[in-house]
């Protein structure tokens, strides 16, 4: 497990974007070899997406041979609703890059058969060769995707009822009106993410500090689903200084002492530009 600690949100976002960029380029994707990337929504990854868009526009990075799989989608929210995750991904990322829309996979929360939709999503991931790198964020209660506290740590893509804490947290996106917030969602399972060859979790802000503490300093616990990734062979937690406030001083000191190693993963930043 790696814990990468940056000074602030902007630097954490940039480090994560550089890492994704380098992983894609080093993979050497092509028409017969697509890079598969799991993606989150929410406020945390926005800075990372902006940097990836910059790398694309500068010619350093192409998503032509990348397939993406998003973590989740609300049930019953129209696809073109401004708060649907289809809209989020299109407006904040996909419309700014060269990904083929047919390669951007997002669960359909309006499918006539939601169980079949979940099973089909798992099948598509398998047919794509599995996820090479799954990027995620967490809630203050340590949930990843919509795997709320108490979720099975071997769960697969499924229909989930959202916890009241999640509904309250999401109300800000629906004019503060709880009656407008969806109460159910389709989500990848913890087991789905664990199957990825590598997982990178973005955690920023003091309000996520206790969740980071639970994620790495205490044992695996289904009440803090992010803690499952202690058992993944290749997990990277990327955080800012504020998110470390609940960690032991010696933990922070230990991982900061490894930053020269971590920075070799992103420096130099690779490029797809032709020399």
UniProtKB/Swiss-Prot annotation:
GO CC list: cytoplasm
Family: Belongs to the glucosamine/galactosamine-6-phosphate isomerase family.
Source organism per UniProt: Xenopus tropicalis (Western clawed frog)
Domain of life: Eukaryota
NCBIfam families: nagB
Organism taxonomic ancestry: Eukaryota, Metazoa, Chordata, Craniata, Vertebrata
Name of the featured protein: Glucosamine-6-phosphate deaminase 2
Active-site residue numbers: 72, 141, 143, 148
Gene3D superfamilies: 3.40.50.1360
Entry keywords, A to Z: Carbohydrate metabolism, Coiled coil, Cytoplasm, Hydrolase
